[in-house]
UniProtKB/Swiss-Prot annotation:
Entries under Gene3D superfamilies matching the protein: 1.10.1390.10, Glucose-6-phosphate isomerase like protein, domain 1
Name this protein carries in UniProt: Glucose-6-phosphate isomerase
Reaction(s) the record says it catalyses: alpha-D-glucose 6-phosphate = beta-D-fructose 6-phosphate
Gene: pgi
Organism: Salmonella typhi
UniProt pathway annotation: Carbohydrate biosynthesis; gluconeogenesis; Carbohydrate degradation; glycolysis; D-glyceraldehyde 3-phosphate and glycerone phosphate from D-glucose: step 2/4
Amino acid sequence: MKNINPTQTSAWQALQKHYDEMKDVTIAELFANDSDRFAKFSATFDDLMLVDFSKNRITEETLAKLQDLAKETDLAGAIKSMFSGEKINRTEDRAVLHVALRNRSNTPIIVDGKDVMPEVNAVLEKMKTFSQAIISGQWKGYTGKAITDVVNIGIGGSDLGPFMVTEALRPYKNHLTMHFVSNVDGTHIAEVLKKVNPETTLFLVASKTFTTQETMTNAHSARDWFLKSAGDEKHVAKHFAALSTNAKAVGEFGIDTANMFEFWDWVGGRYSLWSAIGLSIILSVGFDNFVELLSGAHAMDKHFSTTPAEKNLPILLALIGIWYNNFFGAETEAILPYDQYMHRFAAYFQQGNMESNGKYVDRNGNAVDYQTGPIIWGEPGTNGQHAFYQLIHQGTKMVPCDFIAPAITHNPLSDHHQKLLSNFFAQTEALAFGKSREVVEQEYRDQGKDPAQLEHVVPFKVFEGNRPTNSILLREITPFSLGALIALYEHKIFTQGVILNIFTFDQWGVELGKQLANRILPELGDDKAISSHDSSTNGLINRYKAWRA
């Protein structure tokens, strides 16, 4: 990948000038001036997904200039580098190949002169065999009973992705009950252990190194709890499996290394649900549905790697995001799924985006003088409408939003889905076009009221509109369409990182807090007053010690 400061490109300068021309143009004006706007600014994917980006503060000229920025920063070369297995994660000297994990075409992908696909396929086959034994009841616990509950112990990418997907695909789940434990707060593991039976529970310990503090603390607590009932340590092997590469530590824990499922350094944690980390997904929805998930992502991978930038959905969404973040000063983006099963989707891409692109150092090692990753947040609709939409509609912050909904629901109860979708359509219309003072006054007249007598309240009922949104309408949320949707966002994040000249696939920002926690932990082992930190940290630690005594 080339290291190009985007602000030094001619495209950036052209975009800055274009912004000066566009900043006062409204979405309403753009629609009024172009009856074909929806057709020009929307696209479908595989007849499964419609992406409507027409309700944005953009024109064809805007997109052309953003495409020029992508060309000047060599996005096409970066895409080729990633898919060909080059070590684009330079700070860790690693390839970035989550795309290999879902490479259903099985074309060779070479890393260090070796095709990785045979190993990928071997682990997939091993996961298939193991999961079928668990799901069928062939696998027995230490008292001869079949497994009924699965507890996934992991954190970050080893938790957020599998949890999000198993929730999103609940309509496809089998009889096994899934639980996820991530927080080192003992409350998390304690509450899950109250719900399960040691005789019929399988624990998945998800840690590449088998040394992650939070995960291993929870894993040892689960093991201790299990042995209080099982007694003999040899029974651990029937109730624990590992998603790891550290065979020695896995064996010492008591897990049979035959039940250790490997993944590789070229799999980043927040892109790992496609790997052995996805074993909990397979145990929840079955291997065939997991393959469909992979296939949907692979279809989006092919779209991203082969479609011209002008029609490339991840690239278009990425460019629009850069437009708002860097030229309009929008600091956040909201992801708003109108589907209750997707309630963890925003949280998943909060990590996916903010851990990937939340960086102030560029690929040359210099501090940037422009905006990089946005703040990502969101909740399912319609809950959000009764919480934070007020600020999106009438606040002083610009919050570009992605609205996501399925046309077909898995639960066609009465008219619930029509009411849900009526809100989905209404919100983007309201955000784009608002409500003028004239309309508010006319509404009063239609009610037989005199607007002049209600002047004190009229300004509060006016909506400026001009709030940008993307709408992503899925035919239905299936394993295939969910896989494609996740990959769409993954590639959007990668595209923005390339253009903004940052390393998307490392996460050094999580390290300092860990280091300091390891230093502080032994200081909490006694009641001595602490004076080795700043006055604030000393004061907090000493008050903690006083109160726990």
